């Protein structure tokens, strides 16, 4: 009980600070606690698949971790845990947002953000960014609701691009070796195709020569009979 009283006192002190400096965070702080207390023990029977966009309650976390209620893209499902990339609103005041990766408009960016343009995704009312370096492992119980039209097809080039960048950020050495082997495989495949093409051309020439030889031999046999 003593530890609980200390925690309540600390939270109350923080709430008083936020009340005077950041009322919005205080409200989200409270909503997070309420959601946790209501849903902590509730069973979840959702069927969740990769590529789906949900509204999540990420809870209270340290900066720069994503906190409170935000959208998130599910990129993996393991038992009752989801692997989620948080989504937040695009803010031109932030250099990282302005330099966010986009497969068409900014394909060389090494930013930790991926630009999702509202003109390209039906579930967005305004431009947003995926936070690529803050993948979250969360319970199904953190889901508040599914975003209307919230889906990025895992077979699409955009989703596969997102997945590849995330893979490279979290497993750089493995990703580097994978890309190296992929490039080598492409080189060898191209070389094999070239050799097969040359082989086919050589076989066609050989067949033509055989026909020519057969024709000459036939003519020679005819002349020898005169």
Language model features with spans:
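C-terminal terminal-subdomain/extension
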Residues: 1-32, 102-226
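Short alpha-helix capping/helix-loop boundary micro-motifs
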Residues: 37-43
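Structured loops at beta-to-helix junctions and adjacent beta-edge loops in soluble globular domains
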Residues: 57, 87, 133-135
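Short, charged beta-turn/beta-strand-edge "cap" motif at the junction between a beta-strand
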Residues: 59-64
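Compact nucleic-acid interaction/catalytic patches
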Residues: 65-118
